[in-house]
């Protein structure tokens, strides 16, 4: 398994990614977050999670592991819709955007990530054009 990790994980960003398009490099590392579901309703819930990001594939992509509830919280706070998921974001020099594949048990989603002002907007590639917006960064 050690060789797999050695060829997957990279020390940093590839020079093939222009700095202006380095949208996700700021997230490399380990993060704790609070997931708020059904905000403002009687069903509102708050769940602690983890999000871990690393450069991969010679620094041309960023992969993350999304864990919600967090590994620690999963033991005492079972959630029936818990996620232990991963996403790979690979820079596409032809579109100057990021091709993204998010997958978890039971499904996968393809998105395209671009900067819009001071936000990162990830548009789902399907007939619905759903957007996942990363803001307040």
Please provide the spans of the model-predicted regions:
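Hydrophobic small-molecule pocket/channel-lining residues, especially in calycin-type beta-barrels
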Residues: 1-137
């Amino acid at each position: 398994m050690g060789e797999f990790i050695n060829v997957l994980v990279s020390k940093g960003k590839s020079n093939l990614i222009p700095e202006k398009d380095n949208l996700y490099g700021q997230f490399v590392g380990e993060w704790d977050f609070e997931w708020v579901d059904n905000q403002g309703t009687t069903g509102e819930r708050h769940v602690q999670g983890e999000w871990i990001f690393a450069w991969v594939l010679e620094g041309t992509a960023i992969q993350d592991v999304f864990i919600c509830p967090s590994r620690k919280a999963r033991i005492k706070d079972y959630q029936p819709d818990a996620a232990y998921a991963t996403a790979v974001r690979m820079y596409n020099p032809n579109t100057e955007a990021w091709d993204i594949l998010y997958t978890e048990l039971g499904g996968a989603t393809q998105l395209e990530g671009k900067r819009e002002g001071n936000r990162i907007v990830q548009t789902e590639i399907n007939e619905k054009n759903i957007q996942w917006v990363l803001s307040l960064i």
